[in-house]
Curated annotation (Swiss-Prot):
It comes from Salmonella dublin (strain CT_02021853). This is UPF0294 protein YafD. Disulfide bonds: none annotated. Keywords: Cytoplasm. It is found in: Cytoplasm. HAMAP family: UPF0294 (MF_01119). Belongs to the UPF0294 family. It comes from the Bacteria. It holds the Pfam family Exo_endo_phos.
């Protein structure tokens, strides 16, 4: 779906910018000069949340209370309403969205809000075979204080499909991106891993990419058929804290994770 795949970048005081997929992996970390690092602290805080197209009350309160202190906010089903765009541009240097499909007024898809400008941006889309609706993913790269580059993958996986062929197919280009990146990685989002074959495919992919799963002690993640849908995977970082915020502001609960970019745990 490369033809209709693009990202829209929202920056305060500037018109929205359309960004097309890069033509080669060689541009990872070379497309733009590294600017200010994502965090000046010895920690990176992220919020991961399927925001349910902002259909429920209190979604903005949750973002204001928990997103404003995060260096990265990875949203799925984010609809670019004026309220969300205003929050994003007022609190973050950049907000990149990959429209999965266009609703009557505003596009909906994954959206990554970041405290630094990405030096690389690659939008991805995959169409669900049954409903013919697209799901999107976004790969962005940010400089860290230790000069390493952090790759961030925001994923909303296909939901309605027979078997796992389309599910695994969506992971392939993500794997290509990660395989061409030597630095730390965070991959997170709504993976719709509601069946054992999907869960196995996701875990197999994580192993192949040398990604570890963030564990939540009080695990209040949204579940379907007894299996969690939202995940955070990582490599080259340490996990300091991980929690799940219970809220009625969406049909998913936000995940809050704090990483330190120091020497990764063994």
């Amino acid at each position: 779906m490369r033809k209709n795949t693009y990202a829209m970048r929202y920056v305060a005081g500037q018109p929205a910018e359309r960004i097309l997929p890069p033509r080669s992996f060689a541009s990872i970390g070379q497309a733009l000069p590294a600017g200010e690092p994502l965090s000046s602290e010895e920690r990176i805080r992220i919020l991961v949340w399927n925001i349910f197209k902002q259909q429920r009350a209190e979604w903005l309160s949750v973002l204001k209370n928990y997103g404003k202190d995060a260096h990265l906010v990875l949203l799925q089903e984010a609809q670019t309403t004026p309220e969300l765009v205003q929050f994003a541009t007022a609190n973050y240097l950049a907000a990149d969205q990959v429209p999965a499909f266009v609703l009557p007024q505003h596009p909906s898809g994954v959206m990554t809000l970041s405290a630094a400008h990405p030096v690389y941006c690659c939008p991805l889309r995959e169409r669900e075979p049954i409903l013919r609706l697209a799901k999107s993913a976004l790969v962005t790269v940010y400089p860290l204080p230790d000069t390493r580059l952090l790759m961030v993958v925001n994923v909303h996986a296909v939901n309605f499909s027979l078997g796992v062929d389309v599910y695994s197919k969506q992971l392939l280009p993500i794997g290509d991106q990660i395989a061409h990146h030597s630095g730390p990685v965070i991959m997170a989002g709504d993976f719709n891993a509601w069946s054992r074959p999907r869960m196995n495919a996701l875990y197999r992919f994580a192993r192949e990419m040398s990604l570890r799963q963030v564990r939540f002690t009080d695990d209040q993640r949204r579940r379907a058929f007894g299996r969690p849908l939202d995940f955070v995977f990582y490599r080259g970082l340490n996990v300091n804290e991980a929690s799940v915020l219970v809220t009625r502001a969406s049909d998913h609960n936000p995940l809050l994770v704090e990483f330190s970019p120091g020497k990764p745990e063994q």
